[in-house]
Design a protein with these regions (language model features):
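Short, acidic/polar
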Residues: 1-7, 62, 140-148, 281-291
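N-terminal beta1-alpha1-beta2 module of alpha/beta enzyme domains
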Residues: 1-46, 134
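Hydrophobic faces of well-ordered beta-strands that scaffold small-molecule active sites
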Residues: 16-18, 43-47, 74-78, 136-139, ...
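Acidic-and-aromatic substrate-binding clefts and catalytic sites of carbohydrate-active enzymes
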Residues: 20-27, 51-57, 163-168, 197-198, ...
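Alpha-helix-loop-beta-strand connector modules within alpha/beta enzyme cores
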Residues: 29-49, 53, 104, 108, ...
Length: 306
């Protein structure tokens, strides 16, 4: 991670995001520590951890240690659990479990007594400064997790589509939840998630990349995701083999296969319309980002594909 972190800092990026999928990548918090140690101003985000593979006391200890190492430079991203969960035979956490976990983390990091699964505990560190507690962002692909995040977290990382109706949907969900939970919408952060892929042209890249993580459309509930009902079984068919680490992460032809499946199932045009399509030359990606900025999307969590 060191070369990536140093290059990111030289390029002037705000943050580097590090995945938490222990069967396919190096340990999350050790990687965060390396990146923080080797840089001076770069922020580091866990993108994203989960409430399943670490007890909240373990996660809080790691997070607090990193915050002491590099005050103000850690961001915590969390979700219900993707490859870290299903790769180890676990199901994603229920929304209520994720909510309770975030609450417990925040309590511990504020130096308070936390409650988790019927047990109470707290940090007993000498000299711990609760003001170092980092913001917590929740990655979400649907309205239930988004609503919960507005209640208990500091921001979201939505992957809910980029057609105009998708963007409007996310903004309205956030606005409604801020009213419901009496949050100041101007203090709630949105860091939009999308893939980006460099290539000779956007047209060329899109032959082998969908430009979107369509598997999350059918992870968990499909309610409120703006999916035409007739597409739900087709999307499940398209991603039937997706919970296999070799298939999902090691097959170099995976993107092209998904494009062909989408076309054969009659899903391609719909998926294309809702995709971020951040692909092609730097100029093409920059122009696309500029068009999103004009719609008020000015903070991103980007995953480089390919």
């Amino acid at each position: 991670m060191r070369p990536v972190a140093l290059a990111s800092e030289r390029a002037g990026l705000h943050s580097i995001a590090i995945a938490d999928s222990p069967l396919i990548s190096r340990e999350l918090f050790l990687s965060c520590a390396e990146c923080l140690h080797e840089t001076k101003s770069l922020n580091v985000m866990t993108a994203v951890t989960n409430p399943l593979t670490r007890h909240p006391s373990v996660a809080a200890s790691a997070i607090a240690t990193l915050c002491e190492m590099a005050p103000g430079r850690l961001l915590v991203g969390i979700a219900t659990g993707d490859s870290a969960a299903w790769g180890a035979g676990l199901r994603p956490a229920k929304v209520s479990v994720l909510s309770d976990y975030i609450i417990a983390l925040k309590q511990l990091l504020r130096g308070e007594v936390a409650t988790w699964q019927g047990h109470e505990f707290s940090l007993h560190w000498d000299g711990y400064d609760p003001s170092l507690a980092p913001p917590i962002y929740v990655a979400c692909a649907g309205p239930r997790v988004l609503r919960m995040a507005v209640e208990v977290a500091d921001g979201i990382i939505p992957a809910m589509g980029y057609a105009p109706q998708n963007i409007a949907h996310v903004k309205q969900l956030v606005a409604d939840a801020c009213v419901e939970f009496e949050r100041d919408i101007h203090e709630f952060a949105i860091s939009w998630y999308a893939e980006f892929t460099f290539g000779e042209s956007a047209e060329e890249v899109l032959k082998s990349h969908l430009g979107a993580d369509s598997q999350w459309l059918v992870m968990g509930s499909t309610e409120g995701k703006l999916i035409p009902p007739e597409y739900i079984p087709l999307l499940k068919e398209m991603h039937a083999d997706g919970h296999n680490l070799e298939v999902a992460y090691k097959d170099r032809e995976r993107g092209e296969k998904l494009v062909q499946r989408a076309k054969s199932l009659g899903l391609y045009d719909w998926l294309y319309a809702r995709a971020s399509r951040l692909c092609g030359t730097p100029a093409e990606i920059g122009a696309r980002l500029q068009s999103f900025q004009e719609q008020g999307l000015d903070h991103w969590c980007l995953w480089q594909d390919g």
